[in-house]
Amino acid sequence: MGFARSLCNTNAKLTIKQRFVEGGIIMLHSIKSTNDIKDFLDKTNSLHDGYIVEVKYNNNGISKIKGGHYFEPAKTKLVLQILVTSIWDAVVEIEFENLLEWQIKDNHSDIFDVSVFFNENNLIVWMDDIYTSAEDMKKGSYVIAESMKWRITK
C-alpha cells in the first residue's frame, strides 16, 4: 500500500484536506458533464486503493398493481461508501438515483481504479475497474443510473 500512496495525486490530497479544515457539511457534487467526471476522478484519485465499506439501497419504486408489480426507476437510490486509502484514508460517498441497472459484488470489495462515463443514452455508467466491454463490466461492480452525486465525508 505504501507504494500506491506515493503515486496519489498530491493536489487532490491538499484540496480534500482544505475542505475538511474549513469544516461544515460538504454538499454533494452532481455529475452533469465530462468535466464533472474529470473533477470527480481527480479529487478522489479514481478511488485507487478503495474498499467498499457500506452499500445502501432504497427502492420505493415497486408498486403492486392488478396482475403483478410496477417498477419506477425514478424512485430508486443506491449509496456507496468507499474508503480510499490512497488519499489519506478518506471516505467517498457516491449516490446514484434513478437506477436502471446495478450490481455490487460482495466478494469484490477492493477497488483498484474506476471508470465513469456517459453512455449513448446519456446515462451515467460507473464501473469498479477499467473494462473494455459490457460483458467484462458485468464481472465486477457497476451502476447505470440517470444521476450520480458524490462527496468526501470523512
Question: What would you call each of these model-derived segments?
Answer:
Residues 4, 10-12, 21:
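Short hydrophobic alpha-helical segments enriched in small aliphatic residues
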Residues 18-154:
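Surface-exposed, interaction-prone regions used to assemble/regulate multi-protein complexes
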Residues 14-16:
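N-terminal compositionally biased or targeting/leader segments
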